[in-house]
């Protein structure tokens, strides 16, 4: 009986040691993994755009659908972020015109979200511009921006924290909507058969045809999920 008891204790000890080893190896795997998923609930994207002759811009939010960032040991960044174009909102208008603006932005005149429901930012390279006092880095990012199935190069700066378990990136991206065929009341005009505006022949040559800013500003604050829970 005593021998059986000792045998049970020995087997239990060996099993617990193996289990502990597996857990330690699992943690090492997680911490060495370079791929981080964006925390959709803690990341924010705000858009700004408006009229050329107004001191106030329209602005609102848009949600990230999914995103994955890769960070190498020498702090090189790559990855892809998918934007949910149907989630676009407006925050500056407080009356019944809010819904009208949102619907117009979703229409073929602008982003045509029924046909193109996502946009994409694909980071292709990065470089450190300077190390900041708080151990964060100011980095230059080169990326491909795809909107309405049209892809254009984009370059922007971001302040990143790469040393914490939760990585962060804050910055601003500015793009010209004409690069993606969004030319409603723009300085540049190319015929788009999907746009209602192209059917209004009488006002195309007036000043009102060029009243909306071509540049759209995107302010972003991105946070990843903790790296130690991510396993490929």
Regions found by a protein language model. Give the residues of each.
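Sec-dependent N-terminal signal peptides
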Residues: 4-13
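Low-complexity, acidic/polar, glycine-enriched regions of mature
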Residues: 17-232
């Amino acid at each position: 009986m005593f021998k059986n008891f000792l045998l049970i204790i020995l087997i239990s000890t060996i099993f617990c040691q193996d289990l502990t080893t597996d857990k330690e190896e699992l943690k090492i795997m997680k911490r060495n993994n370079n791929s981080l998923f964006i925390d959709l609930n803690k990341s924010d994207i705000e858009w700004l755009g408006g009229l050329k002759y107004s001191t106030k811009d329209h602005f609102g939010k848009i949600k990230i659908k999914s995103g994955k960032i890769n960070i190498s040991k020498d702090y090189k960044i790559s990855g892809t972020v998918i934007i949910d174009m149907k989630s676009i909102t407006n925050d500056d208008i407080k009356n019944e015109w809010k819904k009208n603006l949102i619907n117009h932005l979703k229409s073929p005149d602008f982003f045509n979200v029924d046909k193109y429901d996502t946009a994409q930012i694909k980071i292709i390279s990065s470089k450190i511009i300077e190390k900041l006092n708080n151990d964060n880095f100011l980095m230059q990012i080169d990326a491909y921006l795809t909107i309405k199935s049209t892809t254009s190069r984009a370059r922007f700066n971001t302040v990143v924290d790469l040393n914490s378990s939760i990585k962060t990136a804050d910055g601003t991206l500015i793009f010209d909507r004409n690069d993606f065929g969004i030319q409603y009341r723009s300085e540049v005009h190319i015929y788009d058969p999907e746009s209602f505006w192209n059917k209004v022949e009488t006002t195309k040559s007036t000043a009102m045809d060029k009243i909306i800013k071509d540049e759209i500003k995107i302010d972003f604050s991105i946070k990843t999920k903790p790296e130690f829970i991510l396993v490929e």
